[in-house]
Amino acid sequence: MASLAAALAPPPPVRIGYVTDVEGNLDYFRRYVRASGVLRFDDDAETVLRFADDGCRFVFGGDAVDKGDGDVRLCRMLADLSDRYGRDRVALLVGNRDLNKLRFTAELSPEALATPPEAVPGPHWDDAAPRLADYLKSKSLDDSRANRLRWMLEHTLGCPGTFEFRRAELKKLRNEDDVTDDDVVDSCVGEVLPGGALRAYLERASVAARFGSTLFVHGAVDAQTAGFVPDKNTRFRVGRHGDAGFPPTKSFMGERDVDAWVRDLNALLAWGLEDHLARPTFAADGSRGGDCLLALQNRCAVWGRSVVSNCYADGGNVDSRSAKTRRARIWAAVREGASTGAYDARAFEASTKYTSDARDPAVHAWLRRSGVKRVVVGHRPVGDSPALLRAATGGVEVVMADTSFADVAAPDKRGASLVVATFEGDDVERTATRIVGSRADGASYEVRVPAPGDDADADDVLGTVDADGWWCKARCEDGFLFSRGDGRKVEYDLRP
């Protein structure tokens, strides 16, 4: 753990604070701010943010909403911070939970509500999800805007608690107890339209952001996403032959370097938001404004090329043996499809448990050619402390910091866990990784890794894996924390 001298030393000139996947949990975000050393609250009510000093930058890694009663207030805070300090110091990333709310304007429109429940399709990426008609029948519910929204949240958006979380937040914002179902629906739809806090967040956000040698995205930079930008005409549906991302075996790394890729992804976001405003409801052919952004966060719509929703982590770590086996099996089927034309765009969906290869040397080489030495992501939970891949010679460091399922027994699924990630140094091009926080049981941990390529003293075991598949995640009071697992099952071992 850090020495007293280190704790008392002045902060480095450059500090990039990072937090991700807060998902409307305002209490968690406030805990982060108080501990960050990068952000501070400017008011007693803790609603206005400011930087600790002029050397600070901040990245919010996406997924601002869904699983707490602070969606609106968190988005307002983050948008306000961006307005006051600018995008050269504040980067807000889009996550799947942020982008997929653009669906509300079309799917809850009067025209859509006129469609009989029996004719409303289920989510194209999940055949197991109940259709709207079956949902209403199973719960003896009438066909209303509110109940359609409840079905969407529970079975197509993965956030069954959001309806009541929003009701609770509206009560706080309005200082009144009488918040109707229609009020909740109006709020959810209104939040993605001008004047809405989520809309403000999206308009100030990026798909990818770069500070010096560190690249930030929500999901993953892998062999499928690197260099790929969806076409503006990409539809939110199962991918088809002839789509820009077809075939899935094609590499796009030769088409753009990292900076051009970041620029074009962010230009697509800006265009897609304008398109959503211009065409917020369904057209006769089933398309809608912002289709390309809904596709961007939906793996099968872009043939497994979603930089927003692809993910590395498995079993709480960078990778696992079972993940490698699944990845090899899925790719064998994909390559077989190359000879027969029998591709399945859903081969890379979360339902197949597919995860990307964070150690792909071709991707690392592509990143390094543009000067990127570190990739930082969220999206996929990694237990109760971040997962780390150390940069081997010629490689890239990867940090994964979503701990939103740190304590599944806790009401908020986080418990006492906290992640405070900072990338710091004398120069934005050469920053070290420093992560401090607490595990689900409240025990503290620390991760200190020098800038990639730096020979400074460090715990060389951090971010490495042993022969039995145990990854070293952090230094704790009594030794090193190791973990291994499969899927979302994680086991831990504390070693001296």
Locate each region found by the language model:
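Feature recognizes metal-dependent phosphohydrolase scaffolds
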Residues: 2-496
